[in-house]
Amino acid sequence: GAVGGAGGVGGHGGSGGASGAGGAQGTGGDGGQGGLAGNGGHGGAGATGGAGGQGGAGDLTLTDSRLLVRGTVELGASAGQGSDGGHGGNGGQAGQDGVAGQPVSATAGEGGAGGAAGNGGNGGMGAQGGNGGDGTLTLSNSALQADTLVLGGRGQAGGNGGHSGLTGKDATGGTDLTVTGGNGGDGGHAGLAGDGLLTVESGRLDVQSGILLGGAGGNGGNGGDLLQSVTLSAGNGGNGSEGGTGTLIFRDGVINNTGQLVLGGSGGSAGQAGLTAAGITGTASTGGLAGNGGAGYARFEQGAGSLGTDLLLGAAGGLTAGSVSAGQGGTGTLLIQNGDFTSQTLLAGGASHGQQMTGETDATAAQAGEGYFTLEGGTFRTGQTTIGATDTAGTSQGHVAVTGGVMATDRMAGLHGTLSVGGESGAALLTGTQDTGWHRWQKGRDWLEGRLGRQLDGTLVITGGQTLDLSSPALDWQVGRGMTTLSLNAGSGNGFGDDSLTIVDAKAFVDSGQVALKTGGAQTSASAQLLMIADDNLKTGDRFALMDGNNGWQSGNVTGTSRLLDTALVTDGTGTSTTVDGADLNQTLSGLRQSVGNLLSRMAATLGVNTQSDNQGQTLVSRATDIRYIASAADSVKIVESALNIAEAGGVQASAVDTGLLPTDRVQQHLSLTRQVPHGDGVDVWVTPLYGHRDMKTLSIDGRDSRAESNYGGLMLGSDWTFSEALAGGDLRTGAAFSVGAGQNRADSGISPTRNNFSYRGVNLYSGWNREAWNVMADAGYTYSSHHVTQTLPDAMEMSALRADMQTDLFTAGLRGEYRWQTSLMDVIPYAGARWARLSTDGSRTRNSEGTVAETSNSHDTFWQFPVGVSVARDFTGNGGLNVRPWLDVGYVHAAGDTRSSARVSLPGLDGTAETGGRLVDRDAFRTRTGVELQKNNWSVGLSYDLQTTSGETDHSVVGSVTYHFR
């Protein structure tokens, strides 16, 4: 809007006219008296100044545009200044008496008296300045770039009052009090300042040097001086106008203000009373009223960016008073409803009060504007937050309210005003950090709400190792609800209200040695909660000062985030402290194996808990046992046990035994009388493909078994030579077989999901002796297995998958004997045997993408198996020499020795180990096999199905065989 024009200056009053001189007496005879001179005319009154013109309103809308202004964008024009009143005119001077005539023949007559002087005219009135026009700018999907942004015009000064005129003069030049000067004209009032409104519907706002919302109030005009006559008056000063209101509505977009954001214009100074000349007892004129500063209001509904370097809410009152008090400072209001915004500092209130006139009865006169900051949603981050100032008597109050969203500030100074946090569960104030997600505090709050079964109302987070001082008697504060209605000096009404949550960074205050909180004797509700963040290498034996009073939280309402540590409050005459002890893991981590629990307790006592450690073992254990990461204690146990027993979770040892004994079983089937494949002198070459599916028990946690599914396949290639009647009248068969295969174990139930991709290769030497119904078999074998285990952690752990590479070596030797009864229906073949096996597992390193999580030692385990059973078979001979032999085998296997592997696991940087191991074989196994052999000439082909069941495993396999007999 255009600036209002200044009013025209009032015209000065005209001076009184001088009287005419008395007439001269005639010469000669007795002349008559000279006639009286006429009175001088009165001076004319000065004209009233013309009013200033009104500024026009400006309205601009930008759509899909970009506006670059190399200077200042002003919305809302300044008011026009009131013009000065005209001075009163001076009184005129009296005329001289007439001159006596000269005697000639008679007596000369006397000259006539001079006429009286005229009065001075009154000064004209100063005119009112024109009003500044309002300015409105709307951005829709547009960008505005400017050096400075000013919303709300400045108020202007009122005009000065005119001086009173001087009294008239007598004929001799002396003062003639009967002839008055003119009255001084009053100064004109300043026009109204225009309001400014900027609305950002969407787009971008870039300001380099700062944003000012709310114009400054104008100064009052000074009164005119009373120069002489007590019966006259000087003109009064005109009133200064109030600053225009500045409003910023930011609906969505990006703001980047690299200067200050000032909300509220300063108040103007009052006009001074006119002076009274020396010796004059009258009262001089009054000065004009000062204008109040315009209010500044900013509302951010959505968006992101920097609001400014310094946010100043509330402006100072006027500096000086006259016959009236100075103007009030404009209030500053900043409201954030959503979005993500930042600044370097926030000062709410703390502006200096202006000067009040002597005897002022209005306590609010010349007061500085108060500052109001409200966060209803979203996030706001700043470096320093100050509420009010130390000089509580001479400055305005500040008000900070977090009713929703998260406010994070590095430093907080609560001096004068109010602070409240609450209104909904998400409302939170973080002090000591600008990280709104600091240390996953929201997860701790969510866990606590879940345990309590209700939402908490308002959260205060204290970190950074710096004391949060809320003890100022001029500060009213509360977290949560139900303490008191906020009003200054509420005393014990301050404190932690119903269902409030206070979160304290324990390690930060252990390290700094400072008390975390000064409350000034505040109260704590019986339902208020305290959550201790146990992290950053906090360990058993640490201690810190929590608060300066004893009105703390009830012991049942104090919770630590780590299940490895116990935090307790201790009060004495000086305040409340927190001690850190080792937790009873039988209570906090029920089901954890004793040796693992001892290892974790040792970590908590020596390394401490640290969810962000470079030591990945410490990080994994700390996160797994922290309520901010894993809500369920049972899940904590599962994750830790799965990670430290990754080999068992992946079924490494069980698979190594199964795939290592599988070739020996195929060799014995190849040599068994059950298949009745004729072997004459010469060489046999045989190939056996196989596929298996296994459902097996892996890791047992808290008495509950976890299971894995395994799918594997392999191929055996063997060859042997038969020597007829080569030993004790029986046939001797000797050969060797090579095996190769691969598979995968998938464990998803009851543990962290684990995959074991394994492969194996081996060699077996075997020999069989057969004489009539007797058959004895012996073998020795070696199998090497390679296992690549991957374990996926829950998403809440925010860690990459665990990996471990393991190698195993299985050596085995076995002996089996069988006898064949031939009946008219079938062959009945009972058998019995013994097998020795030794499994060696190399040491391994469990790791993730950041480093080592755990180290597992090597292990050596030896066990025996004793199989017994019976098989039946029958031959069917067809045309063309084809022989078909179906068979069925039922058996039982008992195991003794090391049926479980045993190793030790350790964490990086920590002395001490825990026991770990996995299932090798079950004590008792039942086996059923059935198949058919087809033989013709030199070829034989077989197919069988095997089923083995134990308490921990069910194994299904399909095996084929192809044999060629060289004769």
Region roles according to the model:
Residues 46-52, 85-92, 120-127, 161-165, ...:
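Extracellular/periplasm-exposed beta-strand and loop segments of Gram-negative cell-envelope proteins
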Residues 362-363, 379, 384-386, 390-394, ...:
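Extracellular beta-strand/loop-rich repeat segments of large surface/secreted proteins
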Residues 1-134, 140, 145-147, 151-175, ...:
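Collagen-like Gly-X-Y triplet repeats in extracellular proteins
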Residues 131, 192, 242, 292-294, ...:
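Residues that define the transmembrane beta-barrel architecture of outer-membrane proteins
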Residues 764, 838, 847, 854-967:
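Outer membrane beta-barrel transmembrane domains
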Residues 61-63, 70, 76, 138-140, ...:
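Feature marks extracellular polysaccharide-active and adherence modules
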Residues 537-583:
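Solvent-exposed adhesion/ligand-recognition segments of exported proteins
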Residues 610-823, 827, 942-965:
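Outer membrane beta-barrel translocator domains of Type V secretion systems
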